């Protein structure tokens, strides 16, 4: 008799990397009986469910199940953050969360004891049913505070937006919670409410946040999308935006206390997307000014995913007059030397924080320097000017701008990639590439056709773009050999008869 399912389980190394214990797992119920099999969900490793035994961790033989039916994953931003668990429907026949149909290709935040059904047969036809019960480790459940909204004085409803008490992020900026748009409800189909995010910031009285003002006018697939803003009587600003559930680039690269490199092809695709976003921003006379790994979000924690630029809290709108900026802002590790950070903090005492020590100021090319630092880290796992890790060391090294391509980490990196990094990390701003020149650099131009195929077909998942007419359905076979379409499946495999 053919087994109903098989499991490709997470390895011991995967679980140890997640802190020695899987933070959550799926309990598998196939054909109407509990298999007593659990599928661990560990940090930044996809758990795919479907019929494809080469790609899925839980392989089902039911013909009503799609090749890849749904995907689960976990995101940890850092040791102090609450782990987030997500499910995404990829099927033709539907995935149900607690009895409600999920929208295809949409991602939903999971909670303890959620029931996921991959097919909804009748009670008399249980053989067609596949149920997965999502269970969170007991030690993690207490991190969620169901009374958060009341404690913080947040509204529960703003126009058509319903704000939940489910946290997906918090920090000095404020809090990010899950919200639903009541206007999207379909009377004909009982869909699970789509998840969005609301960023809630405490403002000074009578001050509208410039981040919201900037984001409301932007519309680009690689920039966080904002739908609505509102300020309540307590001066809480609510920014309703897309939920980007794959974590940030920093946590994606983090392995323990270190950052790891990624393949050159994966780095190239991310750089291409960042350049698309920067080119759009700079054409709109907007400068991000805080581009770093933490502010680059992933839609899913896997190669070939869409990335999104976020956190425009210190972005600058130049108002089309091409003015230069003079404020010392940003993160020193990623900051261009002309911005004006000084290694000796006493030097700031005789100057206003609102004016750079370099009286000439700076322009949008400061974002390209930041991209150079990010690219250096992705290709090598090393921050180019980190030195001993102190702010003083970083600032001094950045002003010198010396790069060491003799490090062993550069051995497998192409000369074109090195040239790209070098051209972005020019201390002489005149010699540094701008966003348009970056897109024309040989590292990008040499692979432009392949990058566009990936960008429009895989990243945007649509048929837009001037060069798509020549793209065939077998685009995957035309990719560079180093492109990884899906995560490797652990070798350990268990089949239940």
Swiss-Prot record:
Enzyme Commission number, as recorded? 2.7.11.1
Similarity comment: family membership:
Belongs to the protein kinase superfamily. CAMK Ser/Thr protein kinase family. CHEK2 subfamily.
| Domain of life according to the entry | Eukaryota
Sorted keywords for this record are: ATP-binding, Kinase, Meiosis, Nucleotide-binding, Serine/threonine-protein kinase, Transferase
List the GO cellular component terms: cytoplasm; nucleus
Gene name linked to the record:
MEK1
Ranges of residues in domain Protein kinase: 162-444
**What processes does the entry annotate via GO biological process terms?**
meiotic cell cycle; meiotic recombination checkpoint signaling; signal transduction
Show the catalytic activity: L-seryl-[protein] + ATP = O-phospho-L-seryl-[protein] + ADP + H(+); L-threonyl-[protein] + ATP = O-phospho-L-threonyl-[protein] + ADP + H(+)
Identify the residues that the record assigns to the FHA domain, covering every copy.
47-102
Q: Which InterPro entries match?
A: FHA_dom (IPR000253), Kinase-like_dom_sf (IPR011009), Prot_kinase_dom (IPR000719), Protein_kinase_ATP_BS (IPR017441), Ser/Thr_kinase_AS (IPR008271), SMAD_FHA_dom_sf (IPR008984)
Q: What residues bind ATP, as annotated?
A: 168-176, 199
Catalytic site positions: 290 (proton acceptor)
- SMART domains (UniProt xref): FHA, S_TKc
**Cross-referenced PROSITE patterns:** FHA_DOMAIN (PS50006), PROTEIN_KINASE_ATP (PS00107), PROTEIN_KINASE_DOM (PS50011), PROTEIN_KINASE_ST (PS00108)
Query: PANTHER family given for it?
Result: SERINE/THREONINE-PROTEIN KINASE
Its recorded name reads Meiosis-specific serine/threonine-protein kinase MEK1
Recorded hits in Pfam families, A to Z, give: FHA, Pkinase
Cysteine-cysteine disulfides: none
- Output the SUPFAM superfamilies linked to this UniProt entry: Protein kinase-like (PK-like), SMAD/FHA domain
**Known role:** Probable protein kinase required for meiotic recombination.
GO terms (molecular function) for this protein are: ATP binding; protein kinase activity; protein serine kinase activity; protein serine/threonine kinase activity
What Gene3D superfamilies has UniProt attached to this entry? 2.60.200.20, Transferase(Phosphotransferase) domain 1 (1.10.510.10)
